[in-house]
Amino acid sequence: MTQLEEQLHNVETVRSITMQLEMALAKLKKDMMRGGDAKQYQVWQSESKAIESAIAIIHYVAGGLK
């Protein structure tokens, strides 16, 4: 088991990381709603997808702990 996997089996660590990612995602979505040019919107979309993927991976590795 990698160090990250070990950390992700700690409920508090999972909550903390997930909360930080969800806050970052909320900020991105808020920025997207404010608007910007097409290129900036694409960057925000890519970042949003990356954060959503990170959350999904954490939940998968952590075995659904939250």
From Swiss-Prot:
It is found in: Cytoplasm. GO terms for cellular component: cytoplasm. Disruption phenotype: Mutant is unable to secrete the Yop proteins upon thermal induction in a Ca(2+)-deprived medium. Pfam families: T3SS_needle_E. Induction: At 37 degrees Celsius in the absence of calcium. Belongs to an operon involved in the translocation of Yop proteins across the bacterial membranes or in the specific control of this function. Keywords: Cytoplasm, Plasmid, Virulence. InterPro entries: T3SS_PscE/YscE. Coiled coil: none annotated. The keyword Cytoplasm applies. Belongs to the YscE family. NCBIfam families: type_III_yscE (TIGR02501). Chaperone of the type III secretion system (T3SS), also called injectisome, which is used to inject bacterial effector proteins into eukaryotic host cells. Along with YscG, prevents premature polymerization of the YscF/SctF needle protein within the cytoplasm. Required for Yop secretion. Component of the heterodimeric YscE-YscG chaperone. The YscE-YscG chaperone forms a stable ternary complex with YscF/SctF. This is Type 3 secretion system chaperone YscE. It comes from Yersinia enterocolitica. The gene is yscE.
